[in-house]
Amino acid sequence: MEPQHDSTPQHGSSGVTVVGMGAISALGPTARHLWDGARQGQVGIRPVQAMEMNGLDTKLGGEVTDPVEPSRGYRHPAGFRERSIELALVAAEEAMAALPAGLVAPERFGVVLGTCNAGLLAGREWLRAVRDGEVPDPELALLVTPQALAESVGAAFRLRGPVLAVNTACASGANAIGLAADLLRAGRADAVLAGGSDAFSDVCFAGFNALQSLSPEPATPYDAGRQGLSLGEGSGMVVLVRAGFAREHGLTAVADIAGYGLSADGFHSTAPHPEGRGAARAIESALRLSGIGPEQIGYVNGHGTGTPKNDPAETNAIRRALGEGWAARTPVSSTKSMIGHMLGAAGAAVAIVT
């Protein structure tokens, strides 16, 4: 038996609630588009239009084709736009609209945002300038690092509470929501904007192509004939407050954050543990924190990338955490078959659509 070392607090509801949501994805420019599209089984994975796909194993992706035009600005060089930040601002503006202006003091309003690749486009532009014998615009240096996403969004809304950047690969958006709930439980903020954002880039596609992870057809998670993943882009954002704060100010609660868990496989740089050990520990931690038993789970929106190694490992993790009996009774699916794998935004988008 594997030894267990888990310091997760074992108590009931965290007392944290979602009062605002925003999203932009291949299914449309709002959280409502994401929700309705997922309910109807719409597939937003189609031929990518905004970049060359030559030499790749796929021509498809969950591309945002709606205009990405946030009303709030951010600091950037003339003639260059960092798409991941603009996607985040569009989703954040929708989520923040749920709160009356001035309800939360800027010093008590936090930001926790996750991303895998925000800044790649800025880095690519820097390298292009160097290659072409130009002097790169110093402003690009402010956008290259992952924290630029959280910093830019926080500044756009003039928020002066804790501003944190999460860069934990494909779990970034989900971890951001969990860490935001921790800030609220600890009394370090009265409201937190949390979520994730990532945009398409040729570097990202090339990386997954090198891993031989891309499917030539739209991804089919958990299917016996799955061929790999479909990349997606976009952003998902939620506004979290303590449940008591929501009641006191008459805010509509969309959902509660009952609990979350963090763990690592420590197994391989690109492959999950085949038995799903790390993922199972995260699920078990989330259940302990929330006080929820396996028999109370009505549905699992899984990671479900559609790769040959991920889906069996994740299935094993669910079985380990819930037990064979309850795992067999619990419906599991993945929205990545509709919006693609949004990387650092994936966990936030999954939370919204669930």
Model-derived features: where do they sit?
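Condensing-enzyme catalytic core mediating Claisen C-C bond formation in acyl metabolism
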Residues: 15-19, 42-47, 57, 218-290, ...
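Short glycine/threonine-rich loop-to-helix capping motif typified by GTGT followed
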Residues: 267-276, 305-322, 342-350
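Phosphate/pyrophosphate-binding loops at sites that engage ATP/ADP/AMP, CoA/4′-phosphopantetheine
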Residues: 93-109, 156, 245-252, 282-299, ...
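Beta-strand segments within the central parallel beta-sheet cores of soluble alpha/beta enzyme folds
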Residues: 50, 106-113, 164-168, 192-197, ...
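N-terminal amphipathic, basic-rich helices that act as targeting or association modules
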Residues: 2-21, 80-105
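ACP-dependent fatty acid/polyketide chain-elongation machinery
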Residues: 1-77, 244-256, 352-354
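Alpha-helical metal-binding/catalytic segments enriched in His/Glu/Asp
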Residues: 180, 235-243, 348-352
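Conserved catalytic cysteine-centered active-site region
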Residues: 10-14, 46-90, 118-179, 188, ...
